[in-house]
């Protein structure tokens, strides 16, 4: 340019130099000849399919992303210079003539018809873009273009599950191709999950050295543990950070399921059949009601594609309610011959349905346990519709909202009393083997707590001769450890002198914590939440607020006693 006197001036410019991720080599653009497809007509049909709700994308926010891509689509470069792929169906004659055909035989026939002589054709060395080939997948794998039985049965399918990062590259291409070549959308729903990142939220790559090998994780912690971690850690369309510590915790969950099941199966083998059938206890009615609620909740969440929440709901039920509470209480009920058969039946029924709930999340351990349960029960305990051949084909458990809300509320109150006493024992370093005395004052739950006194004595480690349950507070001033659960007052006799100052400080801290909760709930219930949230959810929050206020008032009364 200087020699031709075409240079006006020279100036230095700071430029971004693109480099490859792995090797760091400079990437330079180069103009080349490629094959393109005019994709606009196909994009319009694919866009209309989503707008007309023939295809529903979950989460719905990605419909805007989908529309933006298709409304601004450009011609599609479909040729790639790769070693592997579907060859571009184009052949060249020696004179440069181009023949696009279904196969080589057809290309030669067209060449002869046009050129009138036998020639040698050369096929284009390029291959189709991967997304072009994979866009044909929903129907090409079923025998298309032939009208096969598989194509008639499986196309269109119900739902596609994939990552949000290939919504345009793959999902949109499948929709465009499906409509163009079959006249039908390839699927009715698209569920988009997020990406799995490392514990720090970084994308996994060999360069960073943060790639987690799933095979190694499965070898060390189990396939079910990894599967459950991925499912419960995900929400629709959002990335998840994969923590190995979480996988370890879910391995412990698998062990919990195994141990709980081993307990039930062992009791079936150990306890002979007893024809007596007594009325259901409060614990029986509670666990059956909670099972129904859990089945209903899990079903609803799965239908809404909230798979992580569904798995967490099942997790909390089997660990926090079935294993931690009902199994512990069943040990007391199985010691009474009049309640053994009913208790065993409920243990089996709840375990059977819970395994069905968990099967999509932890299929291997649940199938193994269920087969053992089925074999052990034989004809003694048979589900309503019999034992299917395998858990994987067993009917999904149905459930409904509890028709025994009082039983659930009463049992929850009982367990909260036990939990509160256990926490107090821990705070005061009372050995697990040491029995203590307790005075429980309640007017609202007097009958229930009196009936369940044996459970309190056993699970809270209270000495049976030193427990009093009263409806009226007629105590004289004492320095016992004082606790509150809603409107129920609990006073523990630990056979030790209680530090009044320390007890005062503890109660003041509890009152402060309750005040914070009360303030939070008052703000929540005064906000639009109260009008927009479901009525049952709002009612639960109102009930919780009432209980917090009652606990605060009772603790304040106890604080006054200590300060006198």
Where are the regions a protein language model picked out?
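A short glycine/serine-rich beta->alpha loop
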Residues: 127-128, 154-165
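Cytochrome P450 heme-binding Cys-pocket and its upstream "meander" loop
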Residues: 143-151
